[in-house]
Amino acid sequence: MWGCPLGLLLLLLAGQAALEARRSRWRRELAPGLHLRGIRDAGGRYCQEQDMCCRGRADECALPYLGATCYCDLFCNRTVSDCCPDFWDFCLGIPPPFPPVQGCMHAGRIYPIFGTYWENCNRCTCHEKGQWECDQEPCLVDPAMIKAINRGNYGWQAGNHSAFWGMTLDEGIRYRLGTIRPSSSVMNMNEIYTVLGQGEVLPTAFEASEKWPNLIHEPLDQGNCAGSWAFSTAAVASDRVSIHSLGHMTPILSPQNLLSCDTHHQKGCRGGRLDGAWWFLRRRGVVSDNCYPFSGREQNDEASPTPRCMMHSRAMGRGKRQATSRCPNSQVDSNDIYQVTPVYRLASDEKEIMKELMENGPVQALMEVHEDFFLYQRGIYSHTPVSQGRPEQYRRHGTHSVKITGWGEETLPDGRTIKYWTAANSWGPWWGERGHFRIVRGINECDIETFVLGVWGRVGMEDMGHH
């Protein structure tokens, strides 16, 4: 009793398949020709690559071609052609009836021979056979890395920072860091240990801006100046002078003063050492950022000299200095010189750093920056393994310096508790968490607990009264 309906069902299915086949044929016959404006990718090997030439009409004898479909069957050679570019030469042994496009196609536009466009950090050049050749440099903003980090359970989110788009990873390392690793003698300088009182317990969270409101300054932007040595030093000194003067002096100190005037074994926007920066702040001092503003974010060209020093001072006795030059910023009159006492190194111990930070203010830390750090947007950073299987040029790192401002803990959705440091970078407020980042605490992540420095602002009673 089921025979008749089953036969009818099979007949209907066969009819539907035939209709779909006719629709497919109609779509091909009604499609516009692929080469009406000339053959694009005239040197491409399509039929030849697959060793495919088909007789008559064979709709399955097809290959993808620049977002469309091309064919290697005899039927393609009709008035409105949808043949693959090498069909005539490879299958028929004759020249193609359409002229090759004199240039290369990209995003609907034809570029002339030797024309170029940029694909992120790589330049693509149109060559004579209508083919693009692109550089293969690792880019600072790597969309594949961003996806891999955000798919993984790493505790932080990555994203595209528009200021980094178009830069190579090598340029990021060269221009966005700039702290030269200290010499072995400096790395071996004696560590200072603080003393925790009996039964003293440090809080689980602390932020310098909460203990010293209005005395902790926001991050600046070093741009493409490899001057983190100057920016982090000025940032820590600014906060410490403000704290130790009890708010009587709250300067944002000038990184440019260090970049241009601290020239002994320093390279300005091409890198510098922390010990040299602190020596200069102790012996010479610097003015405020308003008085001597950052003069530009592109001071790293090897052929261009560091901008000349525009701030000079003289000794006043007892180590104090007085400016002998007017402010480079003619709109500012105050050219007060700010100084610090000798810098000291903290023990490479989590609690030692916490105690110092809580009692005396933000500290300066050296750290190793890896390729994924540039992509940080939010969360608790730790270096990820997403680039481990890639060539060495995709796995780069360099030395940087930052200002640690606090610490805390966070419980993740899986129940794990992660301890972290809060730190201020020098890439501007658009990067990370309003210019700051959090990084795993207690395991020396990226060597951030290896070389940590503190200092006292040089503040006398005359300074308190003067200000």
From Swiss-Prot:
One of its GO terms (cellular component) is cytoplasm. Glycans are attached at residues 77, 160. The keyword Nucleotide-binding does not apply. Residues 1-21 form the signal peptide. Residues 49-96 form the SMB domain. It comes from the Eukaryota. The keyword Signal applies. GO terms for molecular function: laminin binding. It is found in: Secreted. Keywords: Disulfide bond, Glycoprotein, Secreted, Signal. Pfam families: Peptidase_C1. Glycosylated. Gene3D superfamilies: Cysteine proteinases. Disulfide bonds join 53-72, 70-72, 70-84, 76-83, 84-91. May be implicated in the adrenocortical zonation and in mechanisms for repressing the CYP11B1 gene expression in adrenocortical cells. This is a non catalytic peptidase C1 family protein. Belongs to the peptidase C1 family. This is Tubulointerstitial nephritis antigen-like. It comes from Rattus norvegicus. The lineage of its organism: Eukaryota, Metazoa, Chordata, Craniata, Vertebrata.
